[in-house]
Amino acid sequence: MFHKGLNKEVLIEASKELVEENGIAAFSMRALAEKLGVKTASLYAHVASMDTLFTEVGLSALHDQKVAQLAAIEGKDGDAAVFALAESYRTFAKAHAALYQLIMQMPMGKDETLRAAAAMTAEPSMQVLQGYSIGEERRMHWQRVLRGVMHGFVSQEASGYFSHYPVDLEESYRLAIQCVIDGLHKEAAQNER
C-alpha cells in the first residue's frame, strides 16, 4: 500500500534531515516513519532496506557536495579555484557534519553505483587542477592529495584535535591548501622546462 505523496525522493530528503538532526547512530526506519507520519512497513514499498536507503542518502549528499563545490569554483581558475574548492569542501563538512560522516563511511569500492559516485566527486577537483600544466594521470594523483588534505583537516577539526593550540584554524587550513598549491606549481614548472 502506498501512502499518498510518499516516494523514494521524499524518503531520502526526510532521512537526510533526520541524520543531520540526530546523527547516523540515532537513525532508524521507525524514526523516519514517525517523521513522515506513516507506518514503518510502508517505507519498504520504496526502499529495500535501511542499508539501501543509507546508500541513497549518501549519494544525494555527495551530489549536494559536488553542486556546492562546482558553484564555489565557477568563474575561477588556478590558485583561486583551489582555495574556493577547499573552502567549499570544509564548509560543507562543517555545515553537514553527520551527512559528511555518512559519505565517508560509504564503501565506495564494493558497488558500481558507489564507485561511479566516487568518480563524480572527483570532478570539481579535476576541474580546478586543469589550470596547472600537469598531465591527466598526475591530475588524478593530485586530486587524491588535495582531497586527502581537505578530508584530513576537516576530520581532525571535527574531532577536536586542533583545539589544543591557540593558533588561527583558518590560517592553518589556508597553509595546508597552500602546500598543495606549491606542490602543483613546482610540478607544473618542471613540466614546462
Short names for language-model regions:
Residues M1-L6, A188-R193:
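N-terminal intrinsically disordered/low-complexity leader segments
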Residues K8-E13, E20, A25-A26, G37, ...:
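An amphipathic alpha-helix adjacent to DNA-recognition modules
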Residues V19, L53-A61, I103, P107, ...:
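Alpha-helical DNA-contacting segments of helix-turn-helix folds
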Residues R30-E34, L43:
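Append "Primarily bacterial transcriptional regulators
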Residues E56, L70-L99, K110, I134-E136, ...:
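Hydrophobic alpha-helical connector segments
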Residues L102, G148-P166, D182-Q190:
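Amphipathic C-terminal alpha-helical segment
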